């Protein structure tokens, strides 16, 4: 018996996405996405409502700056106090989980999906998906790309322009192409917010 596409996705097997109701699910998500991206800046309540409708789960005080782009939206889980700047792109053929207090800078891409390297294995659009998990208190810099199957640990910072191909542990600063750990986050970081600029008082 052939395995349904949704089961193939969960099992990490190759799949195609033009059957079994998947196009209809994408259309629903992209219709909401279109409405959100074309809303007026003054329509704050409308945007708040659409954020809750576009994504699978959304915590309190979550905000996304338009435009935002995704495949379905219904596979994206967002925690509390989330903020994403403009041009966030999420390829969510499978689950994307974002923790609490996460900040995402402009032009970031999270993609759970890739294609086989050999051309014969992707001639019909075959692809694979592995979930992405972003921990709590993570800050992702601008123009970062996060590849399929990656987990970023709690409290970590991903430097601008990084391509993240492997898991990043908690409590580190990581950057580069490919992304690698630069250093651990330490007590000095509690007192200096940028280079030698010292924190004088709470904002």
Curated annotation (Swiss-Prot):
Q: What is this protein called?
A: Galactoside O-acetyltransferase
Q: Does the keyword Repeat apply?
A: yes
Q: Where is the active site?
A: 115
* Protein's cellular compartments: Cytoplasm
Name of the encoding gene: lacA
User: What Gene Ontology terms describe what this protein does at the molecular function level?
Assistant: galactoside O-acetyltransferase activity; identical protein binding
Q: Does the keyword DNA-binding apply?
A: no
Reactions the enzyme catalyzes:
a beta-D-galactoside + acetyl-CoA = a 6-acetyl-beta-D-galactoside + CoA
On assembly, the entry states: Homotrimer.
Q: What does the UniProt record say this protein does?
A: Catalyzes the CoA-dependent transfer of an acetyl group to the 6-O-methyl position of a range of galactosides, glucosides, and lactosides. May assist cellular detoxification by acetylating non-metabolizable pyranosides, thereby preventing their reentry into the cell.
Q: Which residues bind acetyl-CoA?
A: 85, 142, 160, 165-166, 180, 183
Transmembrane domains' residue ranges: none
Enzyme class at the top of the EC tree: transferase
Q: What EC number is given for this enzyme? A: 2.3.1.18
What processes in GO biological process is this protein linked to? lactose biosynthetic process
Q: Which organism is it from?
A: Escherichia coli (strain K12)
Any single GO CC term annotated in Swiss-Prot or TrEMBL for this entry: cytoplasm
């Amino acid at each position: 018996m052939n395995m349904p596409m949704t089961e193939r996705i969960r099992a990490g097997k190759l799949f195609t996405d033009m059957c079994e109701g998947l196009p209809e699910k994408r259309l629903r998500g992209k219709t909401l996405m279109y409405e959100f991206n074309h809303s007026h800046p003054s329509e704050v309540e409308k945007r708040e409502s659409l954020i809750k409708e576009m994504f699978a789960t959304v915590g309190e005080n979550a905000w996304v700056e338009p435009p935002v782009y995704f495949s379905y939206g219904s596979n994206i889980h967002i925690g509390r106090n989330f903020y994403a700047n403009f041009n966030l792109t999420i390829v969510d053929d499978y689950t994307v989980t974002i923790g609490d207090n996460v900040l995402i800078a402009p032009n970031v891409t999270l993609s759970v999906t890739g294609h086989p390297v050999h051309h014969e294995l992707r001639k019909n659009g075959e692809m694979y998906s592995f979930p992405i998990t972003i921990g709590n208190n993570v800050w992702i810099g601008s123009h970062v790309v996060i590849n399929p199957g990656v987990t970023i640990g709690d409290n970590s910072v991903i430097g601008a322009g990084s391509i993240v191909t492997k898991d990043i542990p908690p409590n580190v600063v990581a950057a580069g192409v490919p992304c690698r750990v630069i250093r651990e986050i330490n007590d000095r970081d509690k007192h200096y917010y940028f280079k030698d600029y010292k924190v004088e008082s709470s904002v």
